[in-house]
Amino acid sequence: MTAEDLPYRPCVGVMVLNRQGLVWAGHRLAVGNSEYDGSPQLWQMPQGGIDEGEDPLEAACRELYEETGIRSVSLLAEAPDWIHYDLPSHLIGIGLKGKYRGQRQRWYAFRFEGDESEIAINPPPGGHEPEFDAWEWKPMHELPGSIVPFKRRAYEEVVAAFSHLVR
């Protein structure tokens, strides 16, 4: 099986900025044989799949809540284009449950309007499996260096799309 045999997974990504202009990042749980296994760069923003027939903005709000418990947000911006990444060749057939060559993502930026007490990652709300074991607010420019290397270029595009939101 080669990457060309597989589709991209349609996904959303969510950048949440606090009032100080810092971005919410979660430290991924690296469980078993996944695309995160063995990488020290495990900090990422919330993201997830778009369900069949689901509006991407609705998917972004759903994924944000399922992964973090965050609901108190206001929409700031949408990235102008879809952003994608490819899995490295050694993860084809393994990462993303073996079904995809990478992800094609629609990114949204939100302002966090709530209190940090609403953030719940372990366990997250609704009986969902935890995806993160820690979280923190990070400067936007640090995000590409905090993610697994094969997602770095995508994160550079996300930062470029939303850098105007930081004061």
Curated annotation (Swiss-Prot):
Locus of motif Nudix box: 48-69
Keywords from the UniProt entry: Hydrolase
Pfam families: NUDIX
InterPro entries in alphabetical order: Nudix_hydrolase (IPR020476), NUDIX_hydrolase-like_dom_sf (IPR015797), NUDIX_hydrolase_CS (IPR020084), NUDIX_hydrolase_dom (IPR000086), RppH (IPR022927)
Transport recorded as keyword: no
Keyword Ubl conjugation: no
Broad enzyme group: hydrolase
Family matches, as PANTHER family: NUDIX HYDROLASE 26, CHLOROPLASTIC (PTHR11839:SF22), UDP/ADP-SUGAR PYROPHOSPHATASE (PTHR11839)
Function: Accelerates the degradation of transcripts by removing pyrophosphate from the 5'-end of triphosphorylated RNA, leading to a more labile monophosphorylated state that can stimulate subsequent ribonuclease cleavage.
Protein name: RNA pyrophosphohydrolase
